[in-house]
Amino acid sequence: VIIAQTATRLACDRRPYTVEIGNGPRVPARSVIIATGAEYRKPPLENLARFEGAGVYYGATFMEAQLCVGEEVIVVGGGNSAGQAAVFLAQTARRVYVLVRSGGLAESMSRYLIRRIEENPAIVLRTQTEIAALEGDNHLQRVRWRDHRSGNSEVNDIRHVFFMTGGDPNTHWLDGCVVRDTK
């Protein structure tokens, strides 16, 4: 049986298991497959939700890359996912700015990806820099970022931002039923 509703609790102290659906029914089950996905880590930016899918993305696929042909884009993040996204988007975008809050990539990204970023003239690494504001009407049109070393802000006509800052698993409702680590 497939139920396209939100499970809110799993009672696993005896068999059959019981899955609570929203504030409503409880469904007994001999087996439960849990595919909860993750919640993207999102910076506390005004207008972020307004531009999701209209210039703000949490993944870089072929589809998004086609929207960025010949444009300047931003990839936010310092991990391997951000590095892979930057290298991938640099194939179609005119310029890819990689913004990281830290002083570099060495602690969070593989040496191989760092080398590919450094060798790609279409990729510009901006360390100790983060987005301060997103602006536009129905679609993202401008991004203001702040360099924390100098304190200077810069506004750029950029229509596509890729937040590659990780995610947190949607497993909070499984306490006591599955073993989880801190990640």
PLM features: residue spans?
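A Rossmann-like FAD-binding core segment of flavoenzymes
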Residues: 1-21, 26-29, 91-183
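Active-site acidic short loop of glycosyltransferases
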Residues: 29-30, 53, 70, 158
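Glycine-rich dinucleotide-binding loop and its adjacent helix/turn
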Residues: 38-80, 84-92, 182
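Redox-cofactor binding/interface segments in oxidoreductases and associated redox assembly factors
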Residues: 34-35, 75, 163-164
